[in-house]
Amino acid sequence: MPVYVSLVKFTEHGIATMKQEGITRSEKVQRNVESLGGRLLDAYYCLGEYDVVAILEFPNNRAAMKAAVINSSLGHIKITTMPAVSRGEWRDLLREVWGNKPKGK
């Protein structure tokens, strides 16, 4: 299945209600992903501009977009989602574009 990276920011409401609702909301987000045929592969909680980086699989872009809309509508997070390819897929793509030419040619 295609892989997607979601960059997530907590809203002010999300931060203010984290203690009471944080775990429940996290589980709801995961259920929403799964209801669209997706799968949460991993999530990393971060310092900096984004609060969470999630790695997900979805059957297609439409399902990924639906998940972003549904989960953003919960009000506690803002989501930016983008398709991603693995390092191996990237290398295959480069070979398809340029073949197996030696460096400098």
Q: What are these regions, as identified by a protein language model?
A:
Residues 37-44, 79-81:
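A short linear hydrophobic-aromatic micro-motif
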Residues 58-88:
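An amphipathic, aromatic/His-enriched active-site/gating alpha helix that lines ligand/cofactor pockets
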Residues 8, 13-16, 45, 72, ...:
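Flexible, active-site-adjacent loop/turn segments at secondary-structure boundaries
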Residues 1-34, 39, 50, 88-105:
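Short S/T/G/P-rich N-terminal loop/turn motif that feeds into the first structured element of a domain
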Residues 19, 26-28, 54, 65-68, ...:
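Alpha-helix boundary/interfacial micro-motifs
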Residues 18-21, 56, 82:
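Pocket-edge positions in alpha/beta enzyme catalytic cores
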Residues 4-9, 44-69:
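Short, well-ordered beta-strand segments in beta-rich or mixed alpha/beta enzyme
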